[in-house]
Amino acid sequence: FWYMLRSRAVWFFSTSNPTLTFGGFEGESKKEMYDLLPENYFPKTIYISPRQPFEQVQQNVYSGGFSYPFIVKPDVGMEGILFRKIDSEYQLETYHRRMPVEYMVQEFVDYPLEIGIFYYRHPQNASGSITALFSKKLPSISGDGFSTIKELLEKEQTGITEELFKLDEGELDSVLGRGDRINLSFIGNRYHGATFHDLSGQIDERLLNRFDTISHGSRFYYRRYDIK
């Protein structure tokens, strides 16, 4: 509160990332961030307007070199809201017709390890600090050879069971083989059932140098990074 009075600005802290709307704390466009990063630092991405005819969307997707599955999500959004994995043209058309805002089509990166890093740097300093490093474990279920996916979900009592019922009704009655495992979500946050594991013991000078380089190139001074 004192800092707000002293600076005479409610959003005084937004200057920590001057290149982003509200400093990247709320309402920023993902495109804003990606435009400041080298292309090899994020998955292949295109942006779709909700006003585009679906035929144009199809053309953009194919000319962009995408193949199913891929990810769609709003350009402005958080907490995994309206994030979807698209496996077919029908799913893409359904998503497009229901989507009221600009969204992004993004390459599906299916690596087993996802980590989060929190980094900050004062603009006057050459080097910053990494204050958190953690891995994300997505919620999953393992088959027993006779229970359906729906029965396994009910046994697990996961917080996202209802969402899965709505999205994947056709698959809920299939039986998962013994030892076979499927992810219940591809979104790495607590709301969607992910768990987090501390890796701060792995922070070293080499990792810090990498993020110093990113910070100097992008002018991101206060940021969490999600990496696969």
Per-region residue spans from a language model:
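A short alpha-helix capping/helix-coil boundary motif
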Residues: 10-15, 71-73, 191
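Alpha-helical membrane-targeting segments
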Residues: 1-18, 24
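A long amphipathic alpha-helix within ATP-dependent nucleotide-binding catalytic cores
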Residues: 153-228
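Active-site nucleotide/adenylate-binding loops and adjacent lid/helix of ATP-dependent enzymes
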Residues: 18-19, 29-164, 204-209
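Active-site rim elements
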Residues: 20-24, 197-200
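Short secondary-structure junctions and interdomain/linker hinges
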Residues: 5-8, 44, 68, 160, ...
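Short, compositionally biased low-complexity segments
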Residues: 5-11, 31-38, 177-189
